[in-house]
Amino acid sequence: MSLLALGINHNTASVALRERVAFGPDCIDRALRELVAQPGVSEAVIVSTCNRTELYCSLAQGQGEQVLQWLQRFHGLDAAEVVSAIYQHQDEEAVRHLMRVACGLDSLVLGEPQILGQIKQSYAHAQQSEAVKGSLERLFQKSFSVAKRVRTDTEIGASAVSVAFAAVSLGRRIFSDLSQTKVLLVGAGETIELVARHLREQNVTQMMVANRTLQRAQLLAEEFGAQVMTLEEIPDYLHEADIVISSTASPLPIIGKGMVERALKARRFKPMFLVDIAVPRDIEAEVDELSDAYLYTVDDLQGIIEQNLETRKRAAAEAELIVQEERDDFMGWYRSQHSVDLIRDYRHQSQQVADEELQRALLALQQGENAEQALKALAHRLTNKLIHAPTQALRHAAAQGDHHQLAQLRQMLGLSQES
């Protein structure tokens, strides 16, 4: 048996191709059942996210091409469409690849933690479809523990490397407990949505969403339990906000110095933290002149991100060493499983020989043969049959002049070294 990792990701395939190769919730169970029904495939897990689709299989040697052909058939793809984007890893490299993916070392954003949850969900699907057991089950459990160790023993996830995460991280520098703050989000696009998710992870429950169109803001508000307002209503509510994070496509500033100054007076000059992620700016630069307003722009965040990315790169180097160590540990276990099968088969074969010769000896005794002669014959035949295969191997190695194999056979048979 062999382990296989086969797939495409953001480094090898366009978004258009990744969309065509993806496995959605509506087809994942059927796909798993079909995959494990392929000749030689005993286990399978399918990991499918926006940035990658990967098939992990335990299968007979040389069956990787069959898995690739199944993938093409399932999605109705021509070989020419995927051949340049597909990568395949076997055994040690397949193990290393999965562990790196689980740790976020192969992600578009180095060290991002979301991929681990996605892999766990994929593994759960495989369990529900009874598509995973044995070696592949052990590999995924091992990969989860490796990812946890990397998170614990390195700083791979300690620093913000996205604009949204950096904005929230800056807020924590000013307000140690974000759960006690009220946040105004200006805009309702993808970046603001990601900011809202990070805020929720920090237990922020008081959010306001201001947007040019209320429909999009309401969708965001429903998900995060936020209050909704138009951009024109911001002056009426700005004083309630401890934190303001803005990201719109407005060509002109939405929040001016005078508006913030009035809000600070209403707050009795309690500090206000503002992050302007937009280009061009949503918040007038002069706001930074106010003593109780702390304004950061996307340029400030970029500097933090670049500094943090260097920290993550150093942590990633440490993580790679952990992955290598854990891969070797898993492969030691995996190879030992092959010896378990071999030992079982060898014992079964030897037991069959012993049973046959025992029955032959008992029959001889029943027919009146002398007991001593019957036992001597039993010992002679049993010895000859049990040493036949090793003897043939020794003769073949000697005939080939293979001294290395002869030494290995001598050690295996427990023979003392030649004088």
Curated annotation (Swiss-Prot):
Pathway: Porphyrin-containing compound metabolism; protoporphyrin-IX biosynthesis; 5-aminolevulinate from L-glutamyl-tRNA(Glu): step 1/2. The keyword Cell wall biogenesis/degradation does not apply. SUPFAM superfamilies: Glutamyl tRNA-reductase catalytic, N-terminal domain, Glutamyl tRNA-reductase dimerization domain, NAD(P)-binding Rossmann-fold domains. NADP(+) binds at G187, A188, G189, E190, T191, I192. The record marks H97 as: Important for activity. One of its GO terms (molecular function) is NADP binding. Transmembrane segments: none annotated. One of its GO terms (biological process) is protoporphyrinogen IX biosynthetic process from glutamate. InterPro entries: 4pyrrol_synth_GluRdtase, 4pyrrol_synth_GluRdtase_dimer, 4pyrrol_synth_GluRdtase_N, GluRdtase_CS, GluRdtase_dimer_dom_sf, GluRdtase_N_sf, NAD(P)-bd_dom_sf, Shikm_DH/Glu-tRNA_Rdtase. Pfam families: GlutR_dimer, GlutR_N, Shikimate_DH. Catalyzes the NADPH-dependent reduction of glutamyl-tRNA(Glu) to glutamate 1-semialdehyde (GSA). Homodimer. During catalysis, the active site Cys acts as a nucleophile attacking the alpha-carbonyl group of tRNA-bound glutamate with the formation of a thioester intermediate between enzyme and glutamate, and the concomitant release of tRNA(Glu). The thioester intermediate is finally reduced by direct hydride transfer from NADPH, to form the product GSA. Possesses an unusual extended V-shaped dimeric structure with each monomer consisting of three distinct domains arranged along a curved 'spinal' alpha-helix. The N-terminal catalytic domain specifically recognizes the glutamate moiety of the substrate. The second domain is the NADPH-binding domain, and the third C-terminal domain is responsible for dimerization. PANTHER family: GLUTAMYL-TRNA REDUCTASE. This is Glutamyl-tRNA reductase.
